[in-house]
């Protein structure tokens, strides 16, 4: 036994040293400096060293002895700065070990890779000491960033995984209850920089079910010494719920970084395919270590992940996704094999061998190596391919849930956040601008863009066509348009938000008299000035809340301008009665078309078009209907006007009208249900009525009808039906109502006799059920199951995608005031919070 253990320790140390050497060899001097000095900076604490702060900051790493590089650094400090570094006191030190995890030291580590560091500490550190250590780590992150190296520290209590502590998708965590999968990744990718060896590696795979007993036997026999090992626990069996939660989180991460996430997504899918008897990859690597089979290029965790995914996809004969995952792997490794290198490193040698096995030719390598120069056609093809792969994983995940009798509402808040993010990123809707470049190519800019209008009655359908070339007949005739839409606003928005249209792009337009080049250039300048391309990703809180309009542009008279008729005409009007909506003797409306362009709190970009005399009324009703009553006002509201005449007057009047209506919509209360705005358009009077859940429009022919409409709205206020005429919705439900979403609100009754349910459908029609009995959890599960199965809403197809599942809320009282919070099942809601004092937020780097 003793010789066996000693052999294992030697293999462990050899593999660990190999990984350290590989991590350093792949990176530049700044990374090497940070990587080498981090243990020293955590072991010591001195004012002249990075990371210093006042207070009783825990210092000292168990079993740490500075190596030659670290000793040289300390000697330099003593020699040139005249400082004396004191060793921490003897005995059990507070930091049990410092480890990297993730792609560092693997073939997947690239020149742009960041560092994820686990700082494992003793469980006896108190709350204040943990906070001080966390602050020191934050200072070290800033120090590394100043050198151009991205480092993320995670404080890990050595007993954390034994306590089954959990977080949620909304925090700096990896969703609901994913401890075993997190340990799986740590155990297969960890590199010890300093401190104790990892005990789990010493326990044979066939003893995993009796992990603690086997460890105690080793200690009792004196084969191992307890205080020399980091023990985070064994890899026990995984629940179906954990696979489901982990896969949700991985899909969530993959939306923003699809190439980076494909491999991990498919590893989880492979695990679920083998369920209930999966072979965790960490166990596979450990078995190879115990058997002395140092395969896969030194048990490289990234290569072994590819090997497992390849095995799975080959078994299910999914060669399309197998080809995709190989390309993702190649791009992640970032060794351009089509270009000659004087020095052939180990990563290049590994990749060359794999590419040879895959049978790739030079043309494919050149295409992949040219990714930085991919333009819209290649990017759109890649986007569709990644989307198909992601939706296939999503479908398989839901099938796994059904096969194992899991409710998709096991954690309704998590799935709510994920479905909203999928909905925002991928649901194809009329007027929505699809963003096709999620970190696929760095630059889609085009030197030339041409917009061509085809009027009705031609062979091609009427509308606008966009080409990425100058408008000569040969180039246009022989090429397909990049994009088509009936309205110019949508095409300009698509080109701008996808990065094709920049300040350097030459614009051309064949507008058939509708829009000329100066007007197009004005619009492009306005949109680019008021709508930044890069914004922070929406927070989980924003995704779980009803979407709110953040940036709004109202574009007036872009495609149809009534004032163009004023040219060479005498127009009679009274300067004292300059009403642009009912202008001059003929009371003409000077607003002929309105385009809306807005970005919401989910970072969706939407466009809408209205034309004709009623375009202003229709646009107002539509945009106000998208603002729920408790929404924050938009961050910006801009009016762009492109009239030939009276431009300033029209813009000012529209701006005043829109601002006034938004104020009326967002300030309306239940006590003021009769608020309205009268507007005269083309000689006719219209009333905009600001009701609790929406905005209605009514034509008012005469004074009696006008007064009657106002009185009716004052008395009743609601245009929707409830259970009885006497039932009133709670104010918080009114404020949370959001069109396009099915919402369930649970409210405990005052006499504690059951609960009430308020249901708002996509059009904000209301149903109310009083004194319900039974289990809310079962209701949530059944409703979620119905919606996920009846419309196959989790399935991607060419004709229909709908990720927008019903949302569930609980009405609670906090300090005497009613509030709406996400409904959580008891099994989830009673878990400890993710951010207790003794807990570092864990772990954004899992599945990153």
Curated annotation (Swiss-Prot):
The keyword Phosphoprotein applies. Pfam families: Adenyl_cycl_N (PF12633), Adenylate_cycl (PF01295). Residues 1-535 are annotated as: Catalytic. It is an enzyme of class 4 (lyase). Residues 541-848 are annotated as: Regulatory. The keyword Transport does not apply. Keywords: ATP-binding, cAMP biosynthesis, Cytoplasm, Lyase, Nucleotide-binding, Phosphoprotein. GO terms for molecular function: adenylate cyclase activity; ATP binding. It catalyses: ATP = 3',5'-cyclic AMP + diphosphate. InterPro entries: Adenylate_cyclase_1, Adenylate_cyclase_1_CS, Adenylate_cyclase_1_N. GO terms for biological process: cAMP biosynthetic process. The modification Phosphohistidine is found at residue 609. It is found in: Cytoplasm. It comes from the Bacteria. Belongs to the adenylyl cyclase class-1 family. This is Adenylate cyclase. It comes from Shigella flexneri.
